[in-house]
A protein has these predicted regions:
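Ribokinase/PfkB-type carbohydrate-kinase core domain
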Residues: 1-3, 60-62, 68, 87-232, ...
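Positively charged, low-complexity intrinsically disordered leader regions
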Residues: 1-15
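Cofactor-binding loop segments of dinucleotide-utilizing enzymes, especially the Rossmann-like FAD-
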Residues: 7, 46-50, 155
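Active-site metal-binding loops of divalent metal-dependent hydrolases
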Residues: 8, 27, 126, 154, ...
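Substrate-binding N-lobe of the ribokinase-like
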Residues: 16-90, 98-102
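Conserved phosphate-binding/catalytic region of the ribokinase-like
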Residues: 194-308
Length: 308
């Protein structure tokens, strides 16, 4: 079982021509749906409102095969993100979070997740920012079994991060237990403002405690860099006509984690860069299909079989 923890929200997608569309979203939410669509055993841990938006969020999780027993229902209104698309389909985000559903995840909500002793735990995005959710998920990371693979998708959101110094400190603490880290070049610039990209990648790929850690660094349509300690592999992304980039990184990370768990891989296998690269290649195919559609609409397992 994979547990994905963090926010579920509504993306209000604003197109360059002025059209607006309300779409289910949130990095962890998209990740859970992707794994479910690919056929993985996955549960979502997070707060979901009882309002109409929340009902839609819950229904889509269920439709995609995501277990709901760790979902915490609340009367708080659904958290909202406004995603403004430019002419290339790239999205920039603003968030409306005060008094809404996602941030209020409390420490009492993680007992069920710990009882599962999951094979993998995935977290990131606003789950590293919004309180008390961020403190709760940091505690969860510190308490999962040693056998649980922890994957963190940094997915930094500067516009939702009032205290960048405190945020960086929390991320560093969480990454100390992380086995797989997905970052973008924008994330690296935000986490390490005083370092160039290569130095930042080296810093995040080489934990002070030693051990094996895989870093997957994305850069939009440019090649993905797979880093395991000092080893590097550059992976070209599949060519695709982009409709929009909403959910692209989530789809990539979910595809990687699904492939890793499906293949019976463990934390120890992260030393094998060829294995990490193979899972990243699968993730890039998942992301390529996602960006060819409007909104965060990841592919199903049957679609991945075409051209495999």
């Amino acid at each position: 079982m994979i547990i994905v923890a963090g926010e579920a929200l509504i993306d209000l997608i604003a197109s360059p021509d002025g059209r607006l569309a309300a779409m289910p979203g949130g990095g962890p939410y998209n990740t859970a749906r992707t794994i479910g669509r690919l056929g993985g055993a996955v549960a979502f841990l997070g707060r979901v409102s009882r309002d109409r938006f929340g009902q839609r969020l819950r229904a889509n999780l269920e439709l995609d095969g995501v277990a709901l027993d760790l979902v915490v229902a609340t009367d708080d209104p659904t958290t909202l993100a406004v995603a403004e698309l430019d002419g290339s389909g790239a999205a920039s985000y603003r968030f409306y979070t005060l008094g809404t559903s996602a941030p209020g995840l409390a420490d009492t909500s993680i007992q069920g997740a710990l009882a599962r002793a999951p094979r993998a735990l995935h977290l990131g995005t606003l789950g590293l920012v919004l309180e008390p959710m961020a403190t709760t998920l940091e505690a969860l990371v510190g308490r999962v079994p040693d056998t649980t693979l922890v994957m963190v998708d940094v997915n930094a959101r500067p516009t939702a991060t009032p205290d960048a110094v405190a945020y960086r400190a929390r991320v560093e603490r969480i990454l100390a237990r992380a086995d797989v880290i997905k970052v973008s070049t924008d994330d690296l610039r935000f986490l390490y403002p005083d370092l160039d990209l290569q130095a930042a990648l080296s810093a995040i790929a080489s934990p002070a405690s030693g051990g094996s850690r895989a870093v997957l660094c994305t850069a939009g349509g440019d090649p993905i860099v797979v880093a395991v300690g000092p080893q590097r592999v550059t992976l070209a992304v599949p060519p695709v006509e982009v409709v929009d980039t909403v959910g692209a990184g989530d789809a990539f990370g979910a595809g990687f984690l699904h492939a890793w768990v499906r293949g019976g891989r463990t934390r120890e296998d992260l030393r094998v860069i060829d294995a990490v690269t193979a899972a990243a290649r699968f993730g890039s195919r998942v992301a390529a299909l996602t960006v060819g559609r409007a909104g965060a609409e990841p592919p199903y397992a049957r679609e991945m079989e075409v051209g495999a």
